[in-house]
Amino acid sequence: MGNDMIQVAGRPFSLESTTDFGRVERAILQQMLDSSEWFSYSSMNELRFELNVRINIMESAKEMNASQVTFTIFEHASCNPEYWTLTSTGGFLVRSDVRPSDAILDIYRNGTLYGFECATAIIIIYYQAILKSIGQLRFDSIFQHLYLYSWHTHPGLELHTFHADRFLPGDVVYFNNPDFHPDTPWFRGENAVVLSDGTFFGHGFGIMTAEQMIQSLNSYRFPGSMQPAYLANLITRISPLTIRNLLTLQSDRTTYHYSKAVIHHNLCSISSMDYQYYLLSLNG
């Protein structure tokens, strides 16, 4: 692999030619250059913006770990009624009289009032990271009528999920536990943010190594299981188009006048790929 794995404005990117990236940014760039994946950016600003979003995803994951939000199933979900309406399916609908940015920030500020499962946690982390990256004014203009439920996202946030053997800091991976105990189906897996030091944050488990995450899930298998939990080769990222749109579109051009379908599957801790299958079955 080499410099041609990253292209900026149609030209190969060289890490040696730049000196103004921070330590974490340079580490991410080096992993991108060493991968078999091809990354293309229309400008250096777009590359810098994606790196900033990745760093903010990791920071938002750490902040969630430090908050007092709890892991729970959809039936027992909870939220602050001053900012969100709790739906009968365990989703959170932002109130029309509050700013979406304030509602997201409240999850971190008043964590004891909130309980949700790990897929919802990832989406909250994404929104918090985007808020850090673009500021409250643009966030509130784009992300109106937020609804939090599993992997459901606002039209302004599209995700890209794919199979690969290598991941980058700021990616989301999935620890699969196919032989989960039927009494605790919410331990069927764990969605986790890849941190820059090689550890992972998973809502409900905290910050752990891959081995620790697997051991934790293994303790929730059914008796006699011969299939241990494992780190799947499944990666989820904010889509390149979303990154580009968040960087380039002006706030007065980014109001979305449509909503996306929601699948209220009532299954905690599913992967993004599984949620996409449910969406396809709905549309199929």
Swiss-Prot record:
Catalytic activity, as annotated: L-glutaminyl-[protein] + L-lysyl-[protein] = [protein]-L-lysyl-N(6)-5-L-glutamyl-[protein] + NH4(+)
Pfam families associated with the record: TGL
Keywords: Acyltransferase, Sporulation, Transferase
GO biological process, alphabetically ordered: sporulation resulting in formation of a cellular spore
The keyword Acyltransferase is assigned to this record: yes
Keyword Acyltransferase: yes
Example of a GO MF term: protein-glutamine gamma-glutamyltransferase activity
InterPro entries assigned to the protein according to its UniProt record, in alphabetical order: Gln_gamma-glutamylTfrase_bac (IPR020916)
EC number: 2.3.2.13
Job description of the protein: Probably plays a role in the assembly of the spore coat proteins by catalyzing epsilon-(gamma-glutamyl)lysine cross-links.
Family per record: Belongs to the bacillus TGase family.
NCBIfam families: PRK03187.1
Name of the protein described by the UniProt record: Protein-glutamine gamma-glutamyltransferase
Organism field: Halalkalibacterium halodurans (strain ATCC BAA-125 / DSM 18197 / FERM 7344 / JCM 9153 / C-125) (Bacillus halodurans)
UniProt lineage: Bacteria, Bacillati, Bacillota, Bacilli, Bacillales
